[in-house]
Curated annotation (Swiss-Prot):
Tissues expressing this chain: Expressed in roots, leaves, flowers and siliques.
Protein species of origin: Arabidopsis thaliana (Mouse-ear cress)
Inducing stimuli: Down-regulated by sugar.
GO MF, any single term: 3-hydroxyisobutyryl-CoA hydrolase activity
Protein name as annotated: 3-hydroxyisobutyryl-CoA hydrolase 1
Subcellular localization(s) per the UniProt record: Peroxisome
UniProt binding sites for substrate: E94, G119, E142, D150
Entry superkingdom: Eukaryota
Catalytic activity of the protein: 3-hydroxy-2-methylpropanoyl-CoA + H2O = 3-hydroxy-2-methylpropanoate + CoA + H(+)
């Protein structure tokens, strides 16, 4: 009973005629996704899809975050207690939710008025409409935690213009709302002062046809200018460097750029890469590259294999160490193992992409007569 009450208080539900508004409600934790929240969201999304009276689902966050990611601190506690399979249950449920959202037959509007990181991207970017504001801060910061951009990120990052996805995924770079709109992570940009009116108009929708939501959103959307220092203005440099075959070659290319141009952005990018977990950087790059040629379902199945290896910690224990340094002790000084990129051999990277011994692959549900490896609508 207490579990059910927790999941209901952490995800609030409003019914507005044919529209359902879901609010992530753990503001003190920046709406980090607990296992209860993931289970509740999955239950609600499946129920709304079956209910012919529901035409549109709106998802938003309470407080200054939409969702700052998954509750990885809880997963690390399980790992430290010898229960990595509890963590596997968490990620399998989360990836199932990502897949349901990516293949959803009804329109989903995510209002990203604040922090959107990691798992927060997973419950929004796969949906049809993503609304950024002047308060939006987006990032996939996993390589600094010894993890990798998951929740289907190898699908959506690999589909950004040029090699911008590799840049975002490897460096953990923070994007604002204008940058999200420019690169396609957001579909619309609406000033936060207009969100109440927008929501009221969306709640008048009484049709499954997404063009009704699209027409309303188009009437509210603005096209903000990119800041002068925006990374998106440096897409030519990003493409030259992040198109390289290996992480080592990416860093070398950036260092060559730095000798030709005194640009603080280039040096900050090099520093971000050098601070990340070598194991995480290498598996992240390969994951995004493989994602370009795969459907969203295939990406999630592969990412589940990868995350099981990360949690088992037999190849590298960087996930536990990264969470210790960033989230627990907060000394921001992780001791990565292996310590250097060149010590993370290709044979070690390869192991992350193999099925974990005595562990089943992620089994995705059949969706609307789509193949189980259906393509999402990014």
């Amino acid at each position: 009973m207490a579990v059910e009450m927790a999941s209901q208080s952490q995800v609030l539900v409003e019914e507005k005629s044919s529209v359902r508004i879901l609010t992530l409600n753990r503001p003190k934790q920046l709406n980090a996704l607990s296992f209860h929240m993931i289970s509740r969201l999955l239950q609600l999304f499946l129920a709304f899809e079956e209910d012919p009276s529901v035409k549109l689902v709106i998802l938003k966050g309470h407080g200054r975050a939409f969702c700052a990611g998954g509750d990885v601190a809880a997963v690390v506690r399980d790992i430290n207690q010898g229960n990595w399979r509890l963590g596997a249950n968490y990620f399998s449920s989360e990836y199932m939710l990502n897949y349901v959202m990516a293949t959803y037959s009804k329109a989903q509007v995510s209002i990203l008025n604040g922090i959107v990181m990691g798992g927060g991207a997973g419950v929004s970017v796969h949906g049809r409409f993503r609304i950024a504001t002047e308060n939006t801060v987006f990032a996939m910061p996993e390589t600094a935690l010894g993890l990798f951009p998951d929740v289907g990120a190898s699908y959506f990052l690999s589909r950004l213009p040029g090699f911008f996805g590799e840049y975002v995924g490897l460096t953990g770079a923070r994007l604002d709302g204008a940058e999200m709109l420019a690169c396609g992570l957001a579909t619309h940009f609406v000033p936060s002062t207009r969100l109440t009116a927008l929501e009221a108009d969306l709640c008048r929708i009484n049709s499954n046809d997404p063009t009704f939501a699209s027409t309303i959103l188009d009437a509210y959307t603005q096209h903000p200018r990119l800041k002068q220092q925006s990374a998106y203005r440096r897409l030519d440099v990003i493409d030259r460097c992040f198109s390289r075959r290996t992480v080592e070659e990416i860093i070398s290319a950036l260092e060559r750029e730095a000798t030709q141009e005194a640009d603080g952005w280039i040096s900050a990018t090099i520093q971000a890469l050098k601070k990340g977990s070598p194991a995480s950087l290498k598996i992240s790059l390969r994951s995004i590259r493989e994602g370009r040629l795969q459907g969203v379902g295939q990406c999630l199945i592969r990412e589940y294999r990868m995350v099981c290896h990360v949690m088992k910690g037999e190849i590298s224990k960087d996930f536990v160490e990264g969470c210790r340094a960033i989230l627990v002790d907060k000394d921001k000084n992780p001791k990565w193992e292996p310590r250097r990129l060149e010590d993370m051999k290709d044979s070690m990277v390869e192991q992350y992409f193999e099925r974990v011994e005595r562990e089943d692959d992620l089994k995705l549900p059949p969706r609307n007569n789509l193949p189980a490896l259906g393509i999402a609508k990014l």
